[in-house]
Amino acid sequence: MPRPEKEAVVNELTDKLSSAKSLVLTDYKGLDVATITELRAKLREAGVEYRVVKNTLARIAAKKAEIEEINEVLVGPTAIAFGIEDAVSPAKVLVDFAKEHEELEIKGGVLNGEVIDDEKIKSLAKIPPREELLAKAFAGMKAPLTGFVNVLQGNIRNLVNVLNQIKDQKDE
């Protein structure tokens, strides 16, 4: 690759490393083209970009993005999954895919600027999706209000019942 092309690749990688909410670095050695294509499709569905990188260019980009700690895992064939919109999606898709295809090795990653190992990535993959967490939080906030409304309605309902009974007694 000529030097200007390398500089463009490094600049693009630096932007993605800086802007991504999470990164997952993998070793794809042993996977055939069809399997990698299947993996890319699953990642694309989840809104994740998956890119094979040259380690030397990735090291330069990591230095510019101030996350040089990932240099330790930039050994051998490396591909990076960039979680731009969601921090959990790359981990979830890759961990699930690695269960089916043992050749895919998760090397490590970055979450909100902090380097994490493969075990933390596996823990991250167990977190429910953002929408589910928000739904649980709102349900938790709604429950006390619903209970309070029911208590208020219960008193009003009891008052109406008492008044109806008094009316019925007077009618007789």
Swiss-Prot record:
Gene source species: Halothermothrix orenii (strain H 168 / OCM 544 / DSM 9562)
Family: Belongs to the universal ribosomal protein uL10 family.
A Pfam short name: Ribosomal_L10
Keywords: Ribonucleoprotein, Ribosomal protein, RNA-binding, rRNA-binding
Gene Ontology CC terms, in alphabetical order: ribonucleoprotein complex; ribosome
Thylakoid is among the record's keywords: no
InterPro entries: Ribosomal_uL10 (IPR001790), Ribosomal_uL10-like_sf (IPR043141), Ribosomal_uL10_bac (IPR022973), Ribosomal_uL10_bac_type (IPR047865)
Name of the protein in question: Large ribosomal subunit protein uL10
GO biological process, alphabetically ordered: translation
Assembly and oligomerization: Part of the ribosomal stalk of the 50S ribosomal subunit. The N-terminus interacts with L11 and the large rRNA to form the base of the stalk. The C-terminus forms an elongated spine to which L12 dimers bind in a sequential fashion forming a multimeric L10(L12)X complex.
Keyword Ribonucleoprotein annotated: yes
MF terms (GO), sorted A to Z: large ribosomal subunit rRNA binding
Primary role: Forms part of the ribosomal stalk, playing a central role in the interaction of the ribosome with GTP-bound translation factors.
